[in-house]
């Protein structure tokens, strides 16, 4: 890749980070997709054409899922839109190329009983157990993303006032209410946490045995372990607790706009998926009780 292209990609990364306010993971994925396209196609950013674009996308279609293809298209379209914005191009070679249709995937959720079983499976006689219980209660009680839980700071948690300040995608802040179970688990863990704290991550809530912040993989493995101990065989992840949080709120009548705010969704359309999950509940009720079921 020549110096000019490297400079363009560096500027594009800055644009995504600063002007678009995208999350670091999304920025990395977009830049990686664009760099791969330019490298493999041999096209120059200023001269890339639609024919070469279609050829490249066709070559990638067999190796990528529909969802990954859609993200690739989104990254490339965003890149060339930015070049037009900068005055470096007059057209977007992605125009007229359709993104693959993605079926709306309904996320797996846990029942209230399954949530309770997982919570009860944690060994609270050990500091690590108190920490794990606090993580689980905050994932489910506050609907946090795993990345948000791992980067949560003590100075962002206000148990007496009953809320958590969350730094979400694109460094956007939101306030989320903190229920009694989450507050109790948090304060219980905090009483043993200083034994593991190091200066580097002194304000981070959830620490590993070395005193450093827990990684997303560590939380993922902990969630899987506790699910198995609770006798739950379905495949779950930390995100399942977030989905369950939102679904249970909607099922119990919470306003969709409120749920949107608590999840940190930019668009209400993203949150609306939980109305489809709730529809399974009332559909089952209708089929069970209707005389012509």
Specify the residue positions occupied by each region the protein language model found.
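Conserved catalytic core of the tyrosine transesterase superfamily
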Residues: 1-293
């Amino acid at each position: 890749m020549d110096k000019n292209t490297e400079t363009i990609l560096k500027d594009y990364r800055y644009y995504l980070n600063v002007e678009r306010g995208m999350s670091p993971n999304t920025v990395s994925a977009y830049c990686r997709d664009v760099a791969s396209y330019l490298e493999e196609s041999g096209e120059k950013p200023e001269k890339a054409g639609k024919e070469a674009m279609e050829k490249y996308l066709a070559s990638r279609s067999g190796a990528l899922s529909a969802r990954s293809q859609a993200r690739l298209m989104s990254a490339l379209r965003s890149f060339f839109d930015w070049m037009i914005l900068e005055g470096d191009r007059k057209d977007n070679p992605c125009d007229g190329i359709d993104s693959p249709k993605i079926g709306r995937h309904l996320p797996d959720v846990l029942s209230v009983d399954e949530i309770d079983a997982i919570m009860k499976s944690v060994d609270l006689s050990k500091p690590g157990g108190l920490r794990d219980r606090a993580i689980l209660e905050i994932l489910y009680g506050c609907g946090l993303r795993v990345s948000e839980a791992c980067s949560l700071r003590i100075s962002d948690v206000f148990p007496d006032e009953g809320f958590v300040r969350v730094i979400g995608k694109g460094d956007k802040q939101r306030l989320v209410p903190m229920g009694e179970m989450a507050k109790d688990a948090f304060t219980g863990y905090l009483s043993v946490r200083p034994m593991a704290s190091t200066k580097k991550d002194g304000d981070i809530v959830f620490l590993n045995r070395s005193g450093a912040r827990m990684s997303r993989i560590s939380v993922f493995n902990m969630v899987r372990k506790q699910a198995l101990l609770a006798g739950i065989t379905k495949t779950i992840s930390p995100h399942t607790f977030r989905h369950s949080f939102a679904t249970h709120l909607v099922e119990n009548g919470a306003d969709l706009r409120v749920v949107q705010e608590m999840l940190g969704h930019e668009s209400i359309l993203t949150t609306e998926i939980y109305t489809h999950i709730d529809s399974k509940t009332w559909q089952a009720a209708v089929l069970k009780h209707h005389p012509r079921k």
